[in-house]
């Protein structure tokens, strides 16, 4: 592992992340904790050459934090913009994992495919045995980039 970057608006959650990393032996200057609106951070990072092999994204279902200015966050409404943006931060062979807790979540497959992004649903593989009777505790996807034509074909939209 070369480096990790944790981005969150909340100092509390950044401290939780740092403590969890430390408990797992992941300490040092290669681990960064950034207090920022992730959508703005993604936009800023797209202007750099920094790219990642793996991105893990677990956004809140909803947020109206004053730290976001006038915007609110709604995972159903805003997920495609987030996923497309973070896909642009992946290396060529990179993957992202997108997880959300909205039980009624429906990804906008067409919007993402038109941007060259394909989701592979891995939810069933991420549900602990303790929750076998209630499979709707979250949704989880692998995110990969393709050409738009490939993404449309792989998404069944050609």
PLM regions: where:
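Helix-to-beta-strand junctions that scaffold the AdoMet/dcAdoMet cofactor pocket
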Residues: 90-91
């Amino acid at each position: 592992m070369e480096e990790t970057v944790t981005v969150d608006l909340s100092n509390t959650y950044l401290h939780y992340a740092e403590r969890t990393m430390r408990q797992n032996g992941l300490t040092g200057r290669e681990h960064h904790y950034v207090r920022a609106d992730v959508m703005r951070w993604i936009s800023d990072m797209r202007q750099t050459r920094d790219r990642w092999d793996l991105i893990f994204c677990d956004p809140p279902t909803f947020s109206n934090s004053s730290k976001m200015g006038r915007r609110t966050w709604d995972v159903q409404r805003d997920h495609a913009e987030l996923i497309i943006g973070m896909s642009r931060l992946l290396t060529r062979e990179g993957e992202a994992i997108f997880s959300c807790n909205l039980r009624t979540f429906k990804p906008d497959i067409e919007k993402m495919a038109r941007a060259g992004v394909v989701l592979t649903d891995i939810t069933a593989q991420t549900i602990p045995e303790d929750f076998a009777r209630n499979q709707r505790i979250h949704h989880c996807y692998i995110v990969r980039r393709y050409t738009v034509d490939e993404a449309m074909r792989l998404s069944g939209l050609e």
